[in-house]
Each structure stands twice: as structure tokens, then as C-alpha cells.
Regions:
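N-terminal, polar/Ser/Thr-rich
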Residues: 19-69, 213-218, 225-229
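Residues that flank catalytic or metal-binding motifs in active/ligand-binding sites
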Residues: 53, 85, 113-116, 140, ...
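Intrinsic-disorder/low-complexity, polar/charged segments enriched in Ser/Thr/Lys/Arg/Asp/Glu/Gln
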Residues: 54-56, 67-73, 86, 157-161, ...
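Beta-strand elements of well-folded, non-transmembrane domains
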Residues: 59-63, 74-80, 91-95, 164-168, ...
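Ligand-binding face of N-terminal immunoglobulin V-set domains in extracellular IgSF glycoproteins
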Residues: 66-102, 106
């Protein structure tokens, strides 16, 4: 009996030692290895891809009213092998929106109505931002939903024109008015979220403490900021 117990204990220890020599790999990472988009060496795989977006933006900040108005076009290219049913646009100033979820308790002077989309056009066709079948806003994420027949195919691109505004709060999170003439404007434009080969869309709501994954997809920027006192 003692010999049987010793043999069993030895087998358990051997099995445990073998198990400890391998590491847990999340299923999403393993799928990326299998698809060839990532490699065990930490470098991109032979099938790696990144979606891209090009921004052409213009903004004007009125220091007296603390109102920022912006407009611009985003050209988004789907380099993934997936047909996209929707896009996500990050409205990061919504972290200060009244009634929104956030990691800090703010006074009224630190709250606003969020980033308000005044108009939107997709592929030169004006759309109603209030159409819930096409647009849905959750926290800092704005979903732009395509019909099943008009999904964004692999290799296709889409242009989105936006006009927006928001009230700059006092001493906000990476975004605020500090004096009558000193402003920190960190998240001033709508940004298309990252869609990657591991998790798909970055759907995480920005609540204040964390840095956001999307610093915009790979692409380019053409931007102009109008100085209000010269534009009067």
C-alpha cells in the first residue's frame, strides 16, 4: 500500500511539474497565433494588419464662452479580413457629461452636456444623428451602425463628415480651462476606435482613470485651429 501511495504521489508531482512548464495563453491571443497575425516572438505575424484612418479637422475655441466648435472628415479604411457591421467613434469629452459614469465625483463646474454631434454625413449622404437604427451613444462610445447589406467590406473605405461642439469645463480630465486664457484641450475631436485582430472593437468606456487604447488607428492628420480673437 505504501509503495502504491508513493508511486501515485510521484506521478502527481511529475504531472504538476509538467503543467508548470507551460504558460496559460488567453484564447484570443491563441487565435491570433493560429491566424498568423501575431507571433510567439512578439513581432507581427505574416498575416498582421491594421486599419487606418485619415483626419482632416478644423476647430475653433472661444475663450470667453469656453465653447469648442469643430468639423472635419474621417476616411476609415478596413484592412482587416472582416466585414464590419458597425464603427465606434470615441467621444471622450463625454466623461464630463451630466449623468455619465466616471471614476471621480465632480462638482457642477466640472460637468457639461458632453460632446454634441451637430451634423453627420456618411459617404456624402447627410444622416439624422437621432436615428436610433443607425446611431447609438453609450457613454463615450458612439456606434455607427450599417445595414446588413451595406457592411464595410475588407479593403473598403468610408468617409464620415462631422460637426460637433462641447463646453470646456474648469480643470477637467486632460481637458479644461485653467485661466481665462490658458486651456488644456486633450480630447477635442471624435476619434474612431481601434479595431484589432485580437479583440475586435475597443468598446471600453472612458471613465477617467485609464488611458484609452485608441490613440486613433494608424493614419494621418491634417488639422487647423482657429484663434478666436483673430477670427472675430
Amino acid at each position: 500500500m505504501k509503495r502504491i501511495i508513493l508511486i501515485t504521489a510521484g506521478l502527481i508531482m511529475a504531472t504538476t511539474g509538467f503543467a508548470q512548464s507551460s504558460y496559460f495563453v488567453p484564447k484570443e491571443i491563441q487565435a491570433a497565433y493560429d491566424n498568423g497575425t501575431r507571433s510567439h516572438k512578439g513581432v507581427p505575424g505574416e498575416n498582421y494588419w491594421q486599419n487606418t484612418v485619415k483626419y482632416n479637422l478644423k476647430a475653433e475655441l472661444n475663450p470667453q464662452t469656453k465653447m469648442l466648435n469643430g468639423s472635419g472628415t474621417m476616411v476609415y479604411t478596413n484592412n482587416s479580413p472582416d466585414s464590419l457591421r458597425f464603427l465606434i467613434i470615441k467621444l471622450l469629452p463625454n466623461v464630463h457629461k451630466k449623468g455619465g459614469a466616471r471614476d471621480y465625483a465632480f462638482g457642477e463646474e466640472h460637468l457639461n452636456d458632453g460632446m454634441i454631434i451637430d451634423s453627420i454625413a456618411i459617404s456624402d449622404v447627410a444622416e439624422d444623428i437621432g436615428n436610433r437604427r443607425k446611431f447609438r451613444e453609450f457613454g463615450t462610445n458612439l456606434y455607427v451602425i450599417f445595414s446588413r447589406a451595406n457592411k464595410l467590406a475588407p479593403g473598403a473605405d468610408i468617409d464620415i463628415f462631422l460637426q460637433w461642439h462641447y463646453q470646456v469645463v474648469d480643470h477637467g480630465l486632460r481637458n479644461g480651462a485653467y485661466t481665462d486664457s490658458a486651456f488644456f484641450i486633450g480630447y477635442w475631436y471624435p476619434q474612431i476606435a481601434v479595431y484589432d485582430d485580437v479583440f475586435g472593437w475597443d468598446r471600453e468606456d472612458y471613465t477617467g482613470k485609464q488611458e484609452t487604447y485608441n490613440k486613433s488607428e494608424m493614419g494621418g492628420f491634417n488639422r487647423a485651429v482657429v484663434e478666436w480673437w483673430f477670427a472675430r
